[in-house]
Amino acid sequence: MSENIPDIDPNELLPNAPGQHQDLGVDNPPEPDNASIRAERGSPTPSSVTVDNAPSLPDRSFSHLPINDPFSGEIPEVPIPSSAISISSQALSDPVPTPSDTSRPGILRNDEQGSTSSHPVDPQEPNEVNNEYLAHLLDLGFDEYTAVLALKRTNSAGVEQAVAWIVERSNESDFDEDSSSSENEADEEMGAVQSVAGRTHKMVLVANMSLKMGTGKIAAQVGHATLGVYRQAMNSENGQNAIAAWTRHGQVKIVVKGQSTEQLMDLCKVAKDAGCYYYLVQDAGYTQIPAGSRTVLGIFGTVEQVDSVTGGLKLL
């Protein structure tokens, strides 16, 4: 038995399918109109500006503006006060200060020092020494450095004052006519002298660091100072007793730093006033330093005496 199958039109099954000769442009729809979309949403439509409808800007050039010449007319004269005229004339009449007057602020000229009483000039140490006094000191055998230093410290008061200043700060043996008069006393044995019980002694040697001596040079000068102090102490009975006590307690020796030749000479006087034995070495000048330089000061005595002189100095 055969069934009758009805004929089916393909176009009825696919009504939206495009035909064979249908325009394919419908598959690519055009871009949506943004203006219509903004109108639906309530958004304002931006206005387009072209070259033709652009608004004209104001002309900002100043070429058409007139410029007045400030120097075209007459300049008005400004009256000058009479006080200014008097000041200018006085300034022209005053002398111009010389460089020597203005190079050192606060220092008045010689003619102004006597007339100015409200602001007196402080006394200053003279920079130059009296050449006549210096020549006398050199004739007496003092070296130039010591002579100049003595004249400065005594304000060039005179030769006697300078000599006294040097003597107070030097070895007594430097001015003795016969420095070997105590050689027989030095031959005595130290063990034969009884020391004072309970006394502790020490020796301090002050090196002059301003001379820039080497290590070996300082060691040699310290040896000279130690021997010099020892000889000075052995010249008296009290010194021999002190040396004996010092020997029994280990012969304490301490080397400290001195700042300058002037400090060593001042310490020499302080040691003399304190009752210590002292010796200031003057180098012969064969190596490193000039002849006559004060290199090392040796001080010997009781602990209390020596500490009162060199207690503030630092160890070398």
Swiss-Prot record:
Bias (Low complexity) ranges: 75-89
UniProt entry tagged with the keyword Hydrolase: yes
Bias (Polar residues) ranges: 44-53
GO cellular component, one term: cytosol
PROSITE patterns cross-referenced by the UniProt entry: UBA
UniProt keywords, alphabetically: Hydrolase
Composition skew (Acidic residues), residue ranges: 173-190
Region (Disordered): 1-127, 170-193
Coiled-coil zones: none
EC number of this enzyme: 3.1.1.29
Enzyme class, first EC level, given as a word: hydrolase
GO molecular function, one term: peptidyl-tRNA hydrolase activity
Reaction(s) catalysed (UniProt annotation): an N-acyl-L-alpha-aminoacyl-tRNA + H2O = an N-acyl-L-amino acid + a tRNA + H(+)
Occurrences of domain UBA (ranges): 128-169
Family, as annotated: Belongs to the PTH2 family.
Protein role: The natural substrate for this enzyme may be peptidyl-tRNAs which drop off the ribosome during protein synthesis.
Protein name, per record: Probable peptidyl-tRNA hydrolase 2
Originating species: Caenorhabditis elegans
